[in-house]
Structures are given as structure tokens and as C-alpha cells.
């Protein structure tokens, strides 16, 4: 029997999509949550392959980088698309999501108190342009699939990632008036029984 251990901070962040993959698959794993106080010592021991979180251990073997972990788990549990083309489309969306996250990072860091800058100025100048561009792309994918999922006619891991991000934005008062399709998408994905149960029972964290 394969043993899985996911190590990440006690927050959703970059570890959440992997947790939701496990939840959807009904797969047992160790959800190892590291506090900010514990992290320096863990980092010093080089337990994390690249000196950062999250990382996944599979029968003791370590895999780092959140999207690499998600792609691996998605393949294991059939959430990577039904064909090679669908998998490539999922990966293209994931890469674009990373680009968007990089563009918007100064705003998110300021909101969380981890970075400098005026939140409202960063929202206007950095976040909103990045958000509207990326979510415009997502609308195109939803329209092309016609299924309510971003790629193909079934759930993939990128649905989980985008739905969680949308839900986080909505919970903080994000304006989805221009993107009702993505609000509906988040509601659809997070109403899937396994995901709904996970959301209801997971630890409550600010991010």
C-alpha cells in the first residue's frame, strides 16, 4: 500500500489543491502542517528538496513544487484529463495560472501583510489588470468545453485549483460581476460531495 505524506504550512495556499485531490480520490495521507516557528529548523535540515514548501513524500521519496505534485497526484487518481490533449490543455492553464499569480503577487503579499505597498493602489494597478486578463482566458475555456469544467467533460485538478482561488477571492469581497461563469464554476466544483465534505471539515486558516 502506497504511503503519502504532504508537508506544507498550516494554510491553504500552494498545498490545498493536492489536499483536495486526495479528498476527491478518498485517498488516505498524512497532512503534515508546519508552523512558521517550525519551518526554519526544517529548512535547515534540508528536509525540503528545494528549501521550500510544499513537498510530497511517496513511500519516503520526496517530490517538490506544488504544480509538479498536483500533476503527479492527478495522474495517479485520474484527474489529469481523459486524453493526452486534455492533459496538455490542463497543463497550459496551470502554467498560465502561475503567470497570473506572479503578476498579482505584490498585491496578495501586501494584503497578507508580507510585503510593502498600498493595498488599494496595488489592487488598481497590478491585481485587477492581471485578474481580468486571466479570468477572461478562463471564460474562453469554459465556453469551449461547454461542460461546466475547464477542460473536457469531467473534473481535472485545474478545476480544483481555480475554484479554490475564486472562492477565496469571493470570500474576501471580490467582484465577479464581469465573470459570473467563474463564480458558477467555483460553486459547481465546491459542491462535489467529496470536496464539499473536505471544505466543511478542513482546518480553518486565514489563507
From Swiss-Prot:
Enzyme class: transferase
Positions that bind glutathione: 8, 39, 43, 51-53, 65-66
SUPFAM superfamilies per UniProt: GST C-terminal domain-like, Thioredoxin-like
UniProt-listed Pfam families: GST_C_3 (PF14497), GST_N (PF02798)
GO molecular function: glutathione transferase activity
All residue ranges annotated as the GST C-terminal domain in the record: 83-207
Domain GST N-terminal: 2-81
One biological process term in Gene Ontology: glutathione metabolic process
Catalytic activity: RX + glutathione = an S-substituted glutathione + a halide anion + H(+)
Enzyme Commission number(s): 2.5.1.18
Highest rank taxon of the organism: Eukaryota
Keywords assigned: Transferase
CDD domains xref list: GST_C_Sigma_like, GST_N_Sigma_like
Function, as annotated: Conjugation of reduced glutathione to a wide number of exogenous and endogenous hydrophobic electrophiles. May play a role in the detoxification of reactive oxygen species produced during pathogenic bacterial infection.
Family (UniProt): Belongs to the GST superfamily. Sigma family.
Protein name as annotated: Probable glutathione S-transferase 5
Organism: Caenorhabditis elegans
Amino acid at each position: 500500500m502506497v504511503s503519502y505524506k504532504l508537508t506544507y504550512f498550516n494554510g491553504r495556499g500552494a498545498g490545498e489543491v493536492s489536499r483536495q485531490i486526495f479528498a476527491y480520490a478518498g485517498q488516505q495521507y498524512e497532512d503534515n502542517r508546519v508552523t512558521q516557528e517550525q519551518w526554519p529548523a526544517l529548512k535547515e535540515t534540508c528536509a525540503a528538496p528545494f528549501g521550500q514548501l510544499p513537498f510530497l513524500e511517496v513511500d519516503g521519496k520526496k517530490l517538490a513544487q506544488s504544480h509538479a505534485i498536483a500533476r503527479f497526484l492527478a495522474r495517479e487518481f485520474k484527474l489529469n484529463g481523459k486524453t493526452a490533449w486534455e492533459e496538455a490543455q490542463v497543463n497550459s492553464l496551470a502554467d498560465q495560472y502561475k503567470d497570473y499569480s506572479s503578476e498579482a503577487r505584490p498585491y496578495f503579499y501586501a494584503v497578507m501583510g508580507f510585503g510593502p505597498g498600498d493595498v488599494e493602489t496595488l489592487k488598481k494597478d497590478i491585481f485587477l489588470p492581471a485578474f481580468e486578463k486571466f479570468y477572461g482566458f478562463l471564460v474562453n475555456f469554459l465556453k469551449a468545453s461547454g461542460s461546466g469544467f475547464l477542460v473536457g467533460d469531467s473534473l481535472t485538478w485545474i478545476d480544483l485549483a481555480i475554484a479554490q482561488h475564486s472562492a477565496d477571492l469571493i470570500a474576501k469581497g471580490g467582484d465577479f460581476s464581469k465573470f459570473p461563469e467563474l463564480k458558477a464554476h467555483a460553486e459547481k466544483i465546491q459542491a462535489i460531495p467529496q470536496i464539499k465534505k473536505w471544505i466543511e471539515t478542513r482546518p480553518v486558516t486565514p489563507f
